[in-house]
Structure formats: C-alpha cells, structure tokens
Amino acid sequence: MKETILEMERYAEENNIPIIEVDSIKFIMKYIKLNNVKSVLELGTAIGYSAILMANATSTVEITTIEKDEKRYREAVKNVNKCGLD
C-alpha cells in the first residue's frame, strides 16, 4: 500500500489534484483511532488518497466517499482496489 500512496502523491502533484496535507490526515487518523470512529462520510474523493488512509486507521472504520467528477471517481476506484479495499 505504501508504494500506491507514494504514486498517488506524485500523480496528484503532477496533475494539480488537491489532496489532504500530511499533518491533517495524520490528525484525522489519530482521531479515528482514539475515538473508535465507526464511519466517516467524505465529500470530494478526488483520487481516493484520504479515504484510503482513513480506512487504514483501524480495521473497524467504514468510509463512504463521494466524488462528482467521473475521471477522478474512476481513478479513486482504481487506487482503492490497488490497496485491497472496496
């Protein structure tokens, strides 16, 4: 999964796609763990970067994420699948 995350960061940089800042996602992942969060609704999937990382915060969290852009949606699905998530 780590390699996929690095690929996603490069892809986002090269294609001007906004993804969450590292400090922000670290905070959110810690919050999910400490508060035993069971579900998250994310609006704006982009390429799936934050959804994948949040899904890996704990084994019990369920992420629902919504993306209106068809191209980004397809890219996100591809990335989620590459990380073994669905």
Task: Report each predicted region and the residues it spans.
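A short alpha-helical cap/connector motif
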Residues: M1-D86
